[in-house]
């Protein structure tokens, strides 16, 4: 598609799902889990860790490729990722979903995790894709926190966008993370979401206590709770 011909349309919610919380919860429950079969590839990172890439089906031998980035505590197995990979395939695009460190179902080797400002892993994968497929169009698509990571990468001076990427899309990005965190604390539904993420993150810290103990006190992190409302 010619980028100049793209015309965004305003979002109109269904009458029976006007509220943002309703849309969030119903999408979690009702969204189809159908997606393309994945072929997992494990790539070694320059710092001695690994990343798991899940490749969808290849529509043709010259298909464009799109790297898909999930949101906070997501993975390639989440329904929204499987759905977008399915749609990309239908459009003749070869999807590859990057699982951030610790999100592929297996703890990574190093103490480090992923976060909204960490761009070295998607940068590494995009450079790898460009080396392997120099003649194919390559794009990137990020959801939520994955969108944050993608946009930050695009704005980094050392990242040559024109050489690495032909297109990029960021969806539902929390641009102001501090404001978003404060907003979550102002309602019981927001605190429900925050508790959901915190539970998952604390579990990952518990899995890596031995690795983290020389750097921080992992026990203190596993006892973190949400701040009480003033």
Please provide the spans of the model-predicted regions.
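N-terminal cap/lid segment of alpha/beta-hydrolase-fold proteins
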Residues: 26-57
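Short, surface-exposed "cap/lid" segments of acyl-processing enzymes
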Residues: 59-100
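Primarily recognizes the serine-hydrolase "nucleophile elbow" in alpha/beta-hydrolase
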Residues: 130-132, 137-184
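Serine-hydrolase catalytic machinery in alpha/beta-hydrolase-like enzymes
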Residues: 82, 96-116, 149, 182
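Alpha/beta hydrolase fold serine-hydrolase catalytic domain that processes acyl esters and thioesters
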Residues: 177-220
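N-terminal presequences and immediately downstream first alpha-helices
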Residues: 1-29
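Conserved small/polar residues in nucleotide/adenosyl-binding loops
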Residues: 222-228
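Catalytic nucleophile-loop/oxyanion-hole region of alpha/beta-hydrolase
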Residues: 103-139
